[in-house]
Amino acid sequence: METLSAWIDRQQAHAARQMLRSISPLGIVKARPGFGQLIHPAPGAVVASPVPASYDPDPDYFFHWYRDSAIVMEALRLLHTAGPVDAGGEPRHALALFGEYVGFNAALRGLDGRRLVAASGEWRTRVAPDFVQYLRPDAELERLHGDAVAADTRVNADGSLDISNWARPQNDGPALRALSILRWMRGAALAGELRTTCEALLREDLRFASEHWRLPCYDLWEEERGLHYFTLRVTAQALEEGADWLAERAAAAARGCRAESQAILATLDGYWLPDRGYYRSRLLESGEPSAKELDIAVVLAALQAGDGSVAHSPRDPRIQATLDALDALFEADYLINRGRPAARGPALGRYRGDRYYSGGAYYFSTLAAAELCFRAATGSGRDALLARGDRYLETVRAFIPESGDMSEQFDQRTGEQTSAKHLAWSYAAFISCAAARRAASGRQGGS
């Protein structure tokens, strides 16, 4: 039987090729006849899935989500050290793709919903009568300029505003984009116009993060409005790393970013629920309790934030306790977790009672659990964490077909793939997890 390490190497190569299909997908044209749209992607767009579905039954993910695209760019950065990355025989340089992404995002700053409203007499006539109910009202579009664009969740792959109703605002996008840019700037030789554009985007994203973190928004699952652990944690990290970058450029701005970051982390300390043994994922704007308090979003936040500190990082015992609680939840809830081989860990979802498509399991959730173990694998508990991480990966291996293709979910009862096909986030999560495993093995002195 193929060893786990050999399978990881083979699957990562496939994940890289498939993820690249979502970056600058210029060869795909997306038709949305109900909205009268024909979308020709622009260079630098990163679609959540390159499959042009239309809820038939798979969801339409042919949009550039700010969050998903930043996560994909972080995975691309991890591949960058290998130089050209294979896209089915045609080398595509990671740095060139990052440059396209930066250019695409810079252009978004000029979007203005007021211009869309002024032209609405023309484009609204192309919308089918039964799709009018899904359109954003003119009053909402009128407010869509400046910072509102940065919180607008997603845009079309051609760089135009999304005219359909959706869960807005979402304030994690600028923070995640800032983290992606900061990390590329530290690890790659950016020069000339690309560096200038990166710095301009970065300043805007840090300002947005500093000014908006106290405001309620929708969560990363786009379902509930409130103050969310994920959004707050990635915002705190963006401001902390941004302060380091600003320190020699604008000392006062650096101090401001660092103070806001520390204020956010102090707020997140209050999300710990000692009687339940986990970090809550949200405080709802309504003040009502949420059934989604225990959520993989907390683990995902720790991974995106990185390893710079202990609190609210993969090495935080409370983050690890939150993963333990999630294990117990999905052990009880998912049929595919019952009677599994001892070499496999539990398949994980998002939260209890998820009703989206099959309601999980999710590849990115189970991979996040593995990555958390690898990132936390230091000190006396290292070997146990490495072994635990491998058990999650064995579960992922069991539910990925021989083709290596990854959807968004695998059914909690049957293990069959469901929801969006070729989800870029699934592939990015695999790449990030594999990199964390290699780093952890290096710390151990193994291979």
Spell out what each predicted region is.
Residues 4-15, 85-108, 127, 169, ...:
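Extended, well-ordered alpha-helical scaffold segments
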Residues 2-37, 50, 114, 263-278, ...:
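Non-catalytic carbohydrate-binding regions of carbohydrate-active enzymes
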Residues 168-174, 181-185, 195-250, 254-257, ...:
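Aromatic-lined, polymer-binding surfaces characteristic
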Residues 1-67, 100, 104, 108-157:
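Low-complexity, Ser/Thr/Pro/Gly-enriched N-terminal "stalk/linker" regions
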Residues 70-91, 176-192, 234-251, 300-314, ...:
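Well-ordered alpha-helical scaffold segments within catalytic/enzyme domains
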